[in-house]
Amino acid sequence: MGPANSEGTMFDAFSREVGDYYDQANELLRAMFTDNVHYGYWPDPSSIDPLAEAGERMTEQLYERLDVSAGHKVLDVGCGVGKPAAWLARKTGATVKGANVSRNQLEVARDRVRSEGLEDRVSFDLADAMHLPYADDSFDRIWAIESMIHMPDRDQVMREMARVLRPGGRLAIADIVVRGTLDDVATAVVEGFCTLSTARSLEHIDNYPALVEKAGLDLLELTDVSEQTRPTGPAVLPAFDVLLPTLGEEGVAQSKKAWGDMFDLPQYGYVLLTAGKP
């Protein structure tokens, strides 16, 4: 356990590192992904739909799995700059709480809900998913969109999400994973991607059922959408050029290679899963 910060949340060293990364990279990430700050979903991977449109479809994929209704309390673990949380509140009438370790992203998220008139239904906390500052059985629904890659201990985070989820509640996760067997070359590519993304590690897709079970949850669905998300790689590459003033041409080229190599990797994976609390 790390020291409590001023907002009463327990932060470990890696969570602080992730928060610092998102504080510093916020504008880059918004240039890369638009305000969704997550991968896109292409039903036809050969299509040329823009990333902004595909990003909205990814949010919809999670929404369809959560079955959210008006009156539900929803937790968004790793909420980014708050666009999916605001979208969900508008779409369903639910009350949404976002948790994030980046102060800069939270500032943007709070400005968003103020400008959209959603302050009565959407709020945000500086909070570490390893030690969620909420009482047991607090939420009807939880989603975690691409935040699991930053978690030092996925078992701990799964237990925490299960703890704050009410009996009968539902959890949806979107996560970047690996598939198949990784040789030395693939391992090096994954390590380069993790360094670039400040990811602790990538889980193997085959390990997720056990993670869900150990947390005391029932796995309802696990879908491999690797090919439907792979177009995110080339769609994002041009945005790295905004780093030219700070990294120079060589640094940007290295970053593009680390990013592009991951999406070229056969073992690249992306999973959508839904779990329920008995």
Curated annotation (Swiss-Prot):
Keyword Aminoacyl-tRNA synthetase: no
One GO biological process term: antibiotic biosynthetic process
Residues the record lists as binding S-adenosyl-L-methionine: Q105, D128, A129, H150
Domain of life: Bacteria
One Gene Ontology MF term: S-adenosylmethionine-dependent methyltransferase activity
Observed effect of gene inactivation: Bacteria make 25-O-demethyl-FD-891. Double gfsF-gfsG deletions make a diastereomeric mxiture of 25-oxo-FD-892.
CDD domains named in the record: AdoMet_MTases (cd02440)
Keywords for this protein: Antibiotic biosynthesis, Methyltransferase, S-adenosyl-L-methionine, Transferase
EC number(s) reported in the record: 2.1.1.-
Keyword Methyltransferase in annotation: yes
Annotated pathway: Antibiotic biosynthesis
Main EC class the enzyme belongs to: transferase
Matching SMART domains: PKS_MT (SM00828)
Active-site residue numbers: E146
TM region positions: none
Note: The macrolide antibiotics FD-891 and FD-892 induce morphological changes of human promyelocytic leukemia (HL-60) cells and have cytocidal activity against tumor cell lines in vitro. FD-891 produced by Streptomyces sp. MAFF 225003 and MAFF 225006 inhibits growth of rice and alfalfa seedlings and may cause russet scab in potatoes.
Role played: Methylase required for synthesis of the 16-membered macrolide antibiotics FD-891 and FD-892. In vitro uses S-adenosyl-L-methionine to methylate a number of biosynthetic intermediates in the synthesis of FD-891.
Stated family: Belongs to the methyltransferase superfamily.
UniProt protein name: Methyltransferase GfsG
